[in-house]
């Protein structure tokens, strides 16, 4: 282990890997990435990995637009493949959400999102397999899609290593040293690294690291399920779907399968990130099937058989680290040189690379490509939290 670094990034998920990647790309001296498990060994590995640009606030939209561009040009921007499939993204709004959707689409278009409104009839002209009786309006983003979270993080880290990153896996952080109101080092189970910059990108463990130096935010945790089914040929032609009327999402999955999960408005399932079952529950699978059948009735002959016709392949669960307003906490804290970069609230994967790029620039004393100052944790005490056209919840 090196004795001194110009920056130490704690956490090897999408936020930490992205920040480390861009710090090394900027030539920010000696950069170390410390990960308790292995890279992408935490919540990022279980991400549904949607790449969408549908947000209500300027900073969220700008980060999502930049993120989508990065995934589309991953070899150049992220240092390697990301498994990005530009299959499009579509959101269904119920009658009570129609006006909000009409209001936010021009805002998104103004910040560069390629998105358009579609009536249910227009949607069904292209995807006639759908049933849309409860849908008032839809929006469609042709440049969005989904990616591979593990491959993305591996590409970011390997690229950073080529630029000199020091990677320490299986290395637990035990403390952060400070003096005169600034960080001076990171204490790990393998030794201490002297540094003047620490980035806390620990996801669900971010609040624990912050408390080591008195930085404490009200983060909550929720277990998030995904279920994967075999489906007939043809489903691979569908985009990623956010189904607001039914509170679920689905998208094509590799090998002729479909991934299904619980969407806005999610019911939180409190969990200990250190001790939970990372499989999925039968109750979750049972709850998703009727929603999938209601939206795509042609799946009924298979999924209505006993044991879902043998189509249930597998399921898994990750952990959301959720802030009060469902936006991440990013920026320097009162302890000089200490930067928060966690609280992704289910958005971290798609905007993580763009956050890492702007945070790295700020750390290096450069103007960030996107102004992320509004993501500072100070917003909670200053009454500057974010809202959404969809109301409270994960649909930011």
Regions found by a protein language model. Name each.
Residues 2-15, 32:
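Beta1/beta-strand and adjacent pyrophosphate-binding region of the FAD-binding site
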Residues 24-44:
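Glycine-rich FAD pyrophosphate-binding loop
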Residues 48-126, 247-249, 283:
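Dinucleotide-binding Rossmann-like beta1-alpha1 core, especially the glycine-rich loop
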Residues 58, 62-65, 91-100, 139-158, ...:
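Short beta-strand to alpha-helix junction loop
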Residues 139-196:
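Helical element adjacent to the flavin cofactor pocket in flavoenzyme catalytic cores
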Residues 191-239:
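Central helical "cap/lid" subdomain
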Residues 231-336:
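Active-site lid/adjacent beta-loop-alpha segment flanking the redox-cofactor pocket in flavoenzymes
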Residues 290-396:
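C-terminal catalytic lobe of FAD-dependent flavoproteins
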